[in-house]
């Protein structure tokens, strides 16, 4: 046997080795011509010979985007072009760039260019080339764990994510106790903060090459979405689609999911469950970017994006084609928004399916006033138009249940030195969609509707156009509620005709810059969060809209609200805050990426009491895991509310056990003793019945004798509670 050390080069049989493939790859062309510089283009228009110069000029201009065009030959036969041509580029790199840019490009509605290198012709024509297509190899289906397993937690606990430095971990909430970790902490799990999908099914992380989805009990990796340098993401309402955005344009390649039609685009829409690329979009030049760039209807049947003087609405079920095959032309359109729920319009209530509603607005021009519109889909019918004058901006605020939409109209005086706000509230469930107008003397900065209710809160300030002192608290917090009718006190979710909103209370001299409602309604947190500029310290105020005590903050009484401040927290450094899905707990935290002092988080209950506080070095982010909507019917919810006292005993016991370990051990011990006694009693009963035919624990019937045989005796006992002596003037 020949060893490797004794092997010599002259002993290798070189003549038996086939070098034909290497010779073809590295052969030197006669005359120094490199055929990789030449392109063969198919799919060009067949034009008369007289129009060849025009066609050559158009194609030269197109291919010059990839590099300098040295020569272009367009064959002509019988007075017409043959539909293909040959192009010589200045370099191999320019030719490859042209293939990437224009292979598959639509020249017009009838012509799509197919671009190949001239050397490809030899490869495709060789005997070794496989000309017959084969079915692609479909990878085996990889089953995943139950993606909503966290909802099966016996104690109904919620999960949250903590990010510290480059470490990320998921935890179970245990109120005041140390939270339980889900798996191990992961290093560099995401380049940025992680995000949950709207219903909590997926956890999404950022990476250099795109986005990754995670799920299941142990947060296993599910899918990867290739989009280099991705900076933003969004998920559609039903979690069907993932939207990713990168500032760098897409460059198609063999190892990417992008085709030639995606060249230069920056927005991708993916199927979140399968990981397939559904659609890519470009961004119009000089466009004002308003995130999210792609917005979806509540049921993911339609999506839309803003363009210059047009609104593009896509029919998702029709492979993301434009609705009606064309853009919705709107001169000067500034913004749009889909209703978060389906709307039962009065003229359409006989139909079972609710209506998809969309709102948008256009600014003032020389010929027409500013207008806000409500449009139904898919018929694009305008069901309401609100005319506005002297407008500087309009913001759209949808009610969570889509019972109302508020157009926040920021107006100005004719001199444009003073700004103020009008609120135009459209009542979508009433006949002809009436509009309630609330005129305010100050400018609204923030507005938030109560979830599952009809009340709202605003933060505003006087804006006279002058210089402001950032050290002086100048903001107003205003609380609004619908007026209360004396004849019928209907459910708060439905407003009778002509019902109006009234100002319940104004709190002045505030730095407040954020409003956060509990998802369950009733409680609202008005906050001053650190923004790194003017605000250096944070504060937090909790308000109860249904306070049951005697004294309230109400300035008017004929409203469906009993407002009271229940807690005030100040001298903090919060930069962010978020409620959990139940609406029981609010987390406020200080992020190291925004502020360097006292980084960490605090969990408050809805009454403003601190449940857990933890200072964490280099703390970055806190995220509650959302929950899907309840599957209970209205009747089942009503039954649960009716038996709430019965259930609350069990919940209070669980909370007590969580808060006091000694009490928990005592309760568990008593439960075990009671269970043992019940078991012993049943065993004794069965033994006596089987051995002695003796039944224990007999139930004796009550005495049915005539009640007249009994005499009822009443005993009255008097007790002196207080004795006083008082001198009385005599009339004698």
Swiss-Prot record:
The record's section on Pfam families has: eIF2A, RRM_1
Q: Which gene encodes it?
A: PRT1
Q: What does this protein do?
A: RNA-binding component of the eukaryotic translation initiation factor 3 (eIF-3) complex, which is involved in protein synthesis of a specialized repertoire of mRNAs and, together with other initiation factors, stimulates binding of mRNA and methionyl-tRNAi to the 40S ribosome. The eIF-3 complex specifically targets and initiates translation of a subset of mRNAs involved in cell proliferation.
Any Gene Ontology biological process = formation of cytoplasmic translation initiation complex
Q: Which domain of life is it from?
A: Eukaryota
Q: What residue spans carry the region label Sufficient for interaction with HCR1 and TIF32?
A: 1-94
- GO terms for cellular component: eukaryotic 43S preinitiation complex; eukaryotic 48S preinitiation complex; eukaryotic translation initiation factor 3 complex
Q: What is this protein called?
A: Eukaryotic translation initiation factor 3 subunit B
Similarity comment text for this entry = Belongs to the eIF-3 subunit B family.
* PROSITE patterns cross-referenced by the UniProt entry: RRM
The molecular function terms of the Gene Ontology recorded here are: RNA binding; translation initiation factor activity; translation initiation factor binding
Principal cellular location given in the protein's record: cytoplasm
- Keywords of this entry: Cytoplasm, Initiation factor, Protein biosynthesis, Repeat, RNA-binding, WD repeat
WD-type repeats, residues: 185-224, 237-280, 439-481, 507-554
Q: How does it assemble?
A: Component of the eukaryotic translation initiation factor 3 (eIF-3) complex.
Q: Give the stretches traversing the membrane.
A: none
Residues annotated as region Sufficient for interaction with PIC8?
1-219
Signal sequence segment: none
Residues of the RRM domain:
37-120
Q: Which residues form a coiled coil?
A: none
- Family matches, as SUPFAM superfamilies: DPP6 N-terminal domain-like, RNA-binding domain, RBD
Q: Where in the cell is it found?
A: Cytoplasm
């Amino acid at each position: 046997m020949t060893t490797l050390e004794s092997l010599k080069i002259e002993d290798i049989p070189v003549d038996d080795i086939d070098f034909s493939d290497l010779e073809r790859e590295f052969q030197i062309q006669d005359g120094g011509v490199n055929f990789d510089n030449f392109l063969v283009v198919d799919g060009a228009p067949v034009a008369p010979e007289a129009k060849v110069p025009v066609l050559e000029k158009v194609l030269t201009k197109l291919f010059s985007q990839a590099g300098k065009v040295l020569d272009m030959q367009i064959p002509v036969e019988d007075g017409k072009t043959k539909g293909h041509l040959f192009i010589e580029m200045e370099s191999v790199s320019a030719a490859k760039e042209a293939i990437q840019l224009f292979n598959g490009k639509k020249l017009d509605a009838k012509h799509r260019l197919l671009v190949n290198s001239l050397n490809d012709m030899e490869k495709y024509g060789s005997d070794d080339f496989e000309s017959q297509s084969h079915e692609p190899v479909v990878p085996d289906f990889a089953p995943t764990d139950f993606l909503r397993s966290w909802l099966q937690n016996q104690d109904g606990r919620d999960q949250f994510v903590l990010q510290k430095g480059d470490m990320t971990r998921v935890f179970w909430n245990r109120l005041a106790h140390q939270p339980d970790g889900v798996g191990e902490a992961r290093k560099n799990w995401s380049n940025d903060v992680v995000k949950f999908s709207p219903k909590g099914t997926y956890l999404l992380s950022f990476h250099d090459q795109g986005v990754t989805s995670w799920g299941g009990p142990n947060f296993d990796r599910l899918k990867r979405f290739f989009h280099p340098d991705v900076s933003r993401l969004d998920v559609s309402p039903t979690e069907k689609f993932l939207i990713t955005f990168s500032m760098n344009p897409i460059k198609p390649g063999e190892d990417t999911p992008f085709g030639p039609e995606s060249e230069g685009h920056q927005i991708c829409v993916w199927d979140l469950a399968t990981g397939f690329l559904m659609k890519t979009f470009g961004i119009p030049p000089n466009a004002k970017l308003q995130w999210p760039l792609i917005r979806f209807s509540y049921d993911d049947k339609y999506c839309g994006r803003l363009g210059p003087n047009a609104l593009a609405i896509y029919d998702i079920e029709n492979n993301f084609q434009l609705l009606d095959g064309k853009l919705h032309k709107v001169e000067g359109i500034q913004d749009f928004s889909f209703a978060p729920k389906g709307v039962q319009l009065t003229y359409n209530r006989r139909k079972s399916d609710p209506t998809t509603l969309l709102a948008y607005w256009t600014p003032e021009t020389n010929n027409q006033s500013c207008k806000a519109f409500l449009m139904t889909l898919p018929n694009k019918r305008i069901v309401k138009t609100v005319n506005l004058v002297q407008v500087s901006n309009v913001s759209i605020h949808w009610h969570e249940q889509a019972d109302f939409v508020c157009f926040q109209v920021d107006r100005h005086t004719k001199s444009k030195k003073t700004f103020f706000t009008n609120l135009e509230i459209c009542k979508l469930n009433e006949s002809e969609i009436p509009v309630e107008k609330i005129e305010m003397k100050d400018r609204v900065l923030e507005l938030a509707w109560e979830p599952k209710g009809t009340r709202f809160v605003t933060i505003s300030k006087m804006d006279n156009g002058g210089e402001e002192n950032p050290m002086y608290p100048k903001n107003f917090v205003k609380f609004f509620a619908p007026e209360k009718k004396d004849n019928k006190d209907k459910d708060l979710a439905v407003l009778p005709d002509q019902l109006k909103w009234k100002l319940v209370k104004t709190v002045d001299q505030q730095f407040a810059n954020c409003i956060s409602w509990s998802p369950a309604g009733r409680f609202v947190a008005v906050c001053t969060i650190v923004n790194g500029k003017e605000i250096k310290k944070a504060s937090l105020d909790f308000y109860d809209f249904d306070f049951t005590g005697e004294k309230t903050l109400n300035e008017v009484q004929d409203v469906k609200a009993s407002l009271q401040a229940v807690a005030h927290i100040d001298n903090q450094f919060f930069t962010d805050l978020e409620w959990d899905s139940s609406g029981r707990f609010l987390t406020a935290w200080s992020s190291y990426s925004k502020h360097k002092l006292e980084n960490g988080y605090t969990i408050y209950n809805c009454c403003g009491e601190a449940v857990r506080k933890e200072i964490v070095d280099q703390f970055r982010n806190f995220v509650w895991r959302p929950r899907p909507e309840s599957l209970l019917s209205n009747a089942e919810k009503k039954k649960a509310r009716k038996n709430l006292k019965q259930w609350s005993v069990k919940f209070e016991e669980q909370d007590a056990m969580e808060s006091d370990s000694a009490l928990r051990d005592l309760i568990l011990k008593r439960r075990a003793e009671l269970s043992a006694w019940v078991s012993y009693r049943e065993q004794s009963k069965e033994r006596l019945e089987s051995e002695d035919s003796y039944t224990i624990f007999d139930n004796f019937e009550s005495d049915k004798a005539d009640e007249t045989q009994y005499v009822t005796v009443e005993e009255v006992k008097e007790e002196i509670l207080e004795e006083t002596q008082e001198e009385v003037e005599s009339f004698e």
